[in-house]
Amino acid sequence: GDHHFSTLDQNKNWQSQLALFANTGKDKRLKQKLDEHLCGVAEQALSISQYLQRFESEMDLAHDVRILKQKSPAQFAWQDKAVQNIQQFRAQHSDGMERGWFVVNMASTGQGKTIANAKIMRALSEDGASLRYVLALGLRTLTLQTGDAYRHSLGMGDDELAVLIGSKAVLELHQEAVTQQKAQQEEIQDEWAEHGSESAESLLDEHLEYAAVDMPAFMQAVFKGNQAAKSQAFLFKPVLVCTIDHMMAATETVRGGKYILPCLRLLSSDLVIDEVDDFNPQDLVAIGRLVHL
C-alpha cells in the first residue's frame, strides 16, 4: 500500500491544516501531506489485502509438459526412480501432505539434474501433474542458457516461462564489510534524495524476458504504471528462471520495496536452488532465511 500510494501525485483537493509531509517527489519538492499519505496507504493496503489469497490460488500452472511425462533414457533412469519414490511416499502419507517439502538433489555434472528437478517438482506439486516454481541460479550468466534449455529440452513455451536477466554484477548474498556497507548506504541515500521517496522506487529494475499473456483482472488493479506488465509476468508465469539474489530480496531487504515481488511470488511458488554448494557458509545463512520463508 505504501509503495503504490507513494508513486501517486499529491491530491490537490486534499484539505488539511497539517504542516507535516510524508515524502518528496523527483523534483525534491514536498509532495503528499502526512495525513493524506496515511489515509491513502490505509485505503490501498485494505484493497490489496483482499487480493492476497488470490495471489496464491489464481496464478498460472504449466500442465502439459510432455517430456516430463515420458520415461527418461537408460543413463538417466534415476530421474524416474526419484519420481516414483516421491509418488509412493505421498500415497503412503496422504494425511500429512499439507506440510512442506525439503529435498536435496545430489548428482554429478552432466547427470541430468535440470530435467530431474523439473520432474521432481512436477511430482511434488499439489496435483502431481503441474509445474509452478522458481529456479534460482548461482551465476547470472547462466540464466539465458537455462531458459533456452527449458524451452528446448522441456518443450516449454514462452507463455510458460519468464527469465530474469540482471544488468549489473552479482551482489554478495550476505552483508559486506562495514566500510562497504556505509559507502553503499550513502549512495542509496543520495539516490533517494535525487529521485524522491524510497517507497516509490521500481519493484524490478532488471530485464525480464517473457511473452505477454492475459492476466487476471485483479493483478491489473494491483500493479499499474509502465512496469506493471513486467511485475505481473514475474508473479504469474509458471516457471521463473533467475539468480538467487533476486529472490534474496524477500528476506534481506531493509528499506524500500524490493521485497514485495519475491514475497508475493513465493506465496504461490515452489523454489529450486541450483548448485547450492557454490555458496560460502555466510551465504548459506542468508539462503537459510529464504528457505525458512
Regions found by a protein language model. Give the residues of each.
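A substrate-engagement module of RecA-like helicase motors
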Residues: R151-P238, I244-H246
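The Walker A (P-loop) glycine that initiates the GxxxxGKT/S ATP-binding motif of P-loop NTPases
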Residues: A107, G166, E275
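Conserved pre-motif I regulatory segment
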Residues: E58-M106
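Pre-Walker A (Motif I) flank of P-loop NTPase domains
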Residues: M97-V104, S130-R132, F236-P238
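N-terminal accessory nucleic-acid engagement/regulatory domains that precede
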Residues: G1-L68
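Walker A/P-loop
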Residues: M97-I120, F279-N280
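Conserved SF1/SF2 helicase motif Ia
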Residues: I120-G147, G155-D159
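SF2 helicase catalytic motif II
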Residues: M247, I260-H292
